[in-house]
């Protein structure tokens, strides 16, 4: 749809939509214009707009859309400003009717109409000079107006009662979201007639910080109002209307009116108490029992200059209020947290306006939290003394040290910290303010902890604790003013240190005879800079059950700069993690992980003892893990075992070294990058353990300078030799007896783990070299192809040839390195096997079981077609050790009696024979291949030549079929397993039947064929051969070889005499 003037239509829509919904009328108007601009017909636009606007307007949607299209068609929005659309709500209609009839019935001065109506009307002009009317003049005006108002009062009371019963979901006639002038007028009217206070008009007009009347006060109150207070404000306005209407009634209604006002105040006080449940109450409402009513009245003292009395004189109004005397009023102003007290306030009872208040942002009457209102959250959470409302935000990162309040734990040695806490806190209202201190004394801000001198303000006494200090605002301008009701003090010396944990330092009593317990308790443990704790006298041991554990003579650790870590998680026990944590304490000269072969131990060495001592005494969890234990590392190899003590709570961790038990709250800070850099080494732990101590920094730097390959070789070649040294050094250093068998088992386990790690590293390097070699080969192949395509005179030919030469040299070098690595690894493995302890003598039953397992493994490997040479050698070795003959020899004794010895005897004499292949493999080596075309016979033959040497082949092109005889059984097995697929065609392969010669009287068939029929089929008769092959296809297929092997092994088991069957 094409619109003539979008701006005027938007203004018209804003006015129409404002009473219809709670959404922003201007934003909704823009949305409606965007819908209107769609290229649709009127019918489609109406349907779309009804669907889209239903969520905003609900039952008024259809009516609004019809009116909108009528206005667009008649161009009404261009000429006539739209009146708000009257809703169908009965409550709104009732309230509009009340306002209109009130305007028609009340025939009196504009002031009286203004006091009654809550409809939209311009606010009265403010008056600069407020003149307090005489009491007699007020009585005359009252008498002259009674006749005119008598008839209207009953109607006003009745209609006001109807307005009070409007449902909560109905839209009131006055919406606080509309304009600032409405807010000003409603706040002004509300404050004029709802509050009956003894405060003079001049003072009430001058105080703008209470957020009541006047343009400034109303705007401030509107800015700080939140959604939780909106329903309450609506109820207050309706209650104000009812209160004003009844304020003109006769004197016999005053007792009832007072009771109703009292009930409202009690309800407001209970609502305020419920609002601050489970939260810290604001400072001005600490004692709600005594001052809830006064605070209720004082919050509503407006700043409108038109605050003159209208009905009754001052005396009658003062009699009905719960106000205080001028002296108590001045005292309350003195304790108020959002006003500066003056000396004249408690001396002059006349209604003199106080000086302008100090302008700091948080002067809201409800003591709202400024951070919560402006930022949406407050980092103090439930510890904040200011109001967060009924739905506070829970800040999950409250334990973050960078967000916590700048305060430390309670310090009992702070001077005069409890001086002001003996009586009731200032501002509590339970007694007079404590006498002012001397000018030379100091006061402590209860929140920031600042120590500030007491000064006189405007010639009066010192500011109480609750009054904000401008110095505090200069220091922290974003914080709200301090609360008056904070009886707990803080350490004034801990302003700059973030609070980490509430750890209470426990002093250690001196062992010297002159040191008293009281003096030790007074002494504070300060941070040491460069002085070691060697100057501290010798401490006596505390009881054994103390949580601090026994003390250690600090003279032992005065030159120690190494810390030992235990129970470090394996994922965190790395040089990078440890360096990131300990670099903040000083310069690190060495980090050793997996100390003594323990993957959960580490050694961190600092450049000086002072740095190591600061790291040791830090209360911060190492790597954010409380289970990690930190001990002083003992350089001696067990010489001072008698002087070592175990640390309490060490978790059974062997040789734990003690240190000073001072508590030091180190400030976590970003570590400064070290100019020299940390010299870190990862030397061989077993080698250093064999020496019994950690290497010196020079030695460790030398180890760092060594190449990685040398360190790897050192780790692998000296693992076995240093194992005994590690065991010898570990036993005295641990301070506890070890079982020799358990110690040997643990050392062997550590050696195996280290060997696995070395092998994995070597395999990774070898794999990387192989990949590099393959990439070089590809590059060289590409270069050769490029050279072949080039002409002889091509200028690029010479550089390409040079590149090929370089690649060839690199490939040769890589091959040599790979071969050298393999030889080195093989030599290391042989050396480790030689260094291993001799195996325990196995019993005969164990040897038989192992022989059986090995034979089963041999059968399984043969079924899979894998190389079984190593397994056969191991099987033969086991048979020689057990004294039995091999399966092949047992079979040969049956087939060849000319050997002249029974199977058992031959087996026992076997170790005297020369080693080598002494048996004949008589298994079938010929296969029959079918399933191809006759013209493909030659190609199929070439295909099977890839699997080994073919000694004989026979081609029958009529069937067609191919009979192949391989030189070895292994080649035939490979052909059966891997030669089934040929050019996406599956060939059918089976073992050819074996032709046996004329049977001798004592001889038996060598092997049983896989075919189920007669085995006397001759190779010269191919038809019978094909028929036997077709009969055995069901058994052969893809699993031909394993099944044949199983049958062969079953025949072997039946024909030979096994050792375990005896």
Curated annotation (Swiss-Prot):
Disordered as annotated region, ranges: 119-145, 171-340, 416-463, 666-704, 716-741, 822-847, 886-920, 1004-1062
Compositional bias of kind Acidic residues = 1046-1056
Q: Where in the cell is it found?
A: Nucleus
Q: Compositional bias of type Basic and acidic residues: which residue ranges? A: 172-182, 264-273, 294-310
Here the segments flagged for biased composition (Pro residues) are: 423-438
Q: Where are the zinc fingers (C3H1-type)?
A: 363-391
GO terms for CC? nucleus
UniProtKB keywords: Coiled coil, Developmental protein, Metal-binding, mRNA transport, Nucleus, RNA-binding, Transport, Zinc, Zinc-finger
UniProt feature, compositional bias: Polar residues: 134-145, 322-340, 444-461, 1018-1037
Cite the record's Basic residues compositional bias ranges. 234-249
Which stretches does UniProt call biased (Gly residues)? 208-220, 721-733
Annotated PANTHER family: RNA RECOGNITION RRM/RNP DOMAIN (PTHR14398), ZINC FINGER PROTEIN SWM (PTHR14398:SF0)
Q: What does this protein do?
A: Negatively regulates Hedgehog (hh) protein signal in wing development. Regulates neural-specific glycosylation by binding to FucTA mRNA and facilitating its nuclear export in neural cells.
Name of the protein in its database record: Zinc finger protein swm
- What organism does the UniProt record list as the source? Drosophila melanogaster
